[in-house]
Amino acid sequence: MKKTKTVLILAAVTGVLFLGGCGSEKTKIYEQAGKDLSQGSYKYALEEYQSSIQNGVKLAQSYRGAGIASLRLGKYEDAVNSFTEALNCDKVSKSLCKDILSYRATAELKSGKYEDAMADCQTLGEDFSMDAGSYFLTGKVALAMDSYEEAASNFKQAYGEDSTYDMAIEIYEAYLDKDMEADGTRYLEAALSSEAKDAQDHCDRGRVYYYMEDYSNAKKELLEATKKDNTEALLLLGMVYLAQDDVENAQAMYKQYISAVGDSAKGYNGLALCDIRSGDYDSALDNITKGLPTAATDEMQSLLFNEIVAYEKKLDFATALTKVQEYIEMFPEDSAAKKERAFLKTRTSSEG
């Protein structure tokens, strides 16, 4: 009897250890997903969050993580669905609900569902305290819907809450995308009204001057930033030199940037742009290939678009058409790519 009881206890302990180990593995998968998401490894993060969902680990957070990974991968419909599932989970805190709603509105905006995006923005305004990010997002959605006064009002609120170089540039880029550059330029001018206090300020001011096409002042600010080992300034200097058709100095800056930070999608994309400008299309394709493994979604989008351009410049219209069709599947909202596809179809049909 005593022996039987001992066996049962051992079995029970073993079972607890086994279950504990299983739970530990599930937790590790969830934690690894968070690490991969923060490091830009979105494909792996998505797979791991999907496993966490199947395992029932922190469902709201796992659906949120899967949504963010899908968003970064350009899978906007999947992202919206994941965020909706997250919101439908039990015991979602108010702060998490606000966060997920913001992400869902962003995914809806990206997928062209402007009415849905605005509905989520209105919920943010009605049920939560608005911050700079909320105002900016609402402004972007309003701008996409051609509600210019509403957009202007929200952008003004956003900049009032967060009067930084980054916010000024984000608002400028939002207007630039709608061919309303003048409306955005005043935010750049406002950002330049303060003095630079450190290397990052000089870098940010250089970036603002770059957007304003004031390349002389951009170089002045960026060179000041590089004296204090600001690596971002090297990347921006490459952009400034390239804008001035100084390909040699642009290449030098991009190479220096890669040397400083290691393999970089932005650095290789810069080199590819230099190659395209100088007519070395094979080198451009080589640099694009080097940049893709470390690319986040926006960086990948730029690299893949430049890949299309390189094949077109090589007069390899068939490959360019294949590439642009693959690109549009990943980034369906890119109108420039759709125009490029229409052009390439005329060239490939004329070749046939």
Spell out what each predicted region is.
Residues G65, R72, L96-Y103, L137, ...:
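Canonical tetratricopeptide repeat
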Residues S38-Q39, R72-L73, K110, A144-M145, ...:
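Register position in tetratricopeptide repeats
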Residues V57, K91, S95, F128-M130, ...:
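Short coil turns that delineate tetratricopeptide repeat
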